[in-house]
Amino acid sequence: MKKHWIAVDWGTTNFRAFLLNEQQVIASVAQPCGLLTLSKDAFAATLHQHLAPWLTELGALPIVMAGMVGSQQGWQEVPYVAAPANAVKLRKNALPLSTPWGSPAWIVPGVSSASAYGLPDVMRGEEVQLLGLNALHPAHEHHAILPGTHSKHALLRKGEITHFSTLMTGELFSLLSQHSLLGRALPEQQDNSTAFVEGVLTANAGIPFNHLIFSARTRRLNGEIALSAVHSYLSGLLIGYELSTMSAEKESWVVGSPSLCERYLLAAQALDIPLRTADGDTCFLRGMAAFYAQLPETHA
């Protein structure tokens, strides 16, 4: 197995690649060339363009890709793997690709599952972070939150993703703050932890959701929250409502960027929910390394 290899996180809006020596990151590149900006026949050329300096220096390195690159709108669709899923199962169902320059490449499949509420659910990319979390912090069971546009609440047992539920927290915030009455005619917004926590606590008062979010307007109108803190309050409402589904008796992990983890940790503290944080990039790379370790010696 080659020591040098490339891990790629290719999503809807962004492309990120990491050059690794086994598990150590040597270099990285990030570009705003997600799948929404590319036609089907442009993926190979785009990939080569951004990896060219590494390929020139080190040759046709193995490439492992994860994320929406394997969706219907991506380079090639890779069918979801049904939970329970671990690194071995993901490897067996990965899609091998031939690149024009000779690098062996694979796209990691996403995972499908019934949610905690019995509805169908899917993820692409987050499965890698979950496997990385388990590799970094081995335990019989993990309850994990992966915040973002579509936040995932997942359960892992014995290193396998057993089931998960998607909550559209990030996308709802974007829609409500940018395209609804709640975000209209606001001054420049400032982070306000007091308003955020007030939103978190309000969201856990048993108020119907459609009524709850309207308080981002009425509390602004009556002066209970500053005009510059509406986004902080709205964020608190949405994250607080998301966390209302969690048990205060079980410790959970939040896996993501430092800024998002800090926000979720603040909300959890306000609700007395035990929560630990893990860096999303670190978990992603460790999960990709777990996948890479499963590849046949003759290819990697």
Residue ranges: model-predicted function:
Residues W5-A42:
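Short glycine-rich, Thr/Ser-proximal phosphate-binding strand/loop in the N-terminal lobe
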Residues V8-N14, M68, I145-H150, T169, ...:
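A short acidic Gly-Thr/Ser loop motif
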Residues F15, L20, L181-A300:
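ATP-binding/phosphotransfer module of carbohydrate and carboxylate kinases, centering on a glycine-rich
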Residues N21-Q24, W101, L155-E160:
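Short acidic-glycine loop/turn motifs at beta-strand connectors
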Residues L38, V111-P147, K152, L156-G206:
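Glycine-rich phosphate-binding loop plus the immediately following alpha-helix
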Residues Q49-P62, L243-K250:
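Phosphate/pyrophosphate-binding loops at sites that engage ATP/ADP/AMP, CoA/4′-phosphopantetheine
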Residues T56-P120:
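Short beta-strand-loop/turn "lid" adjacent to the catalytic site in phosphate-handling enzymes
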Residues G59-S71, G148, I239, K250-P258:
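Short glycine-rich phosphate-binding loop at a beta-alpha junction
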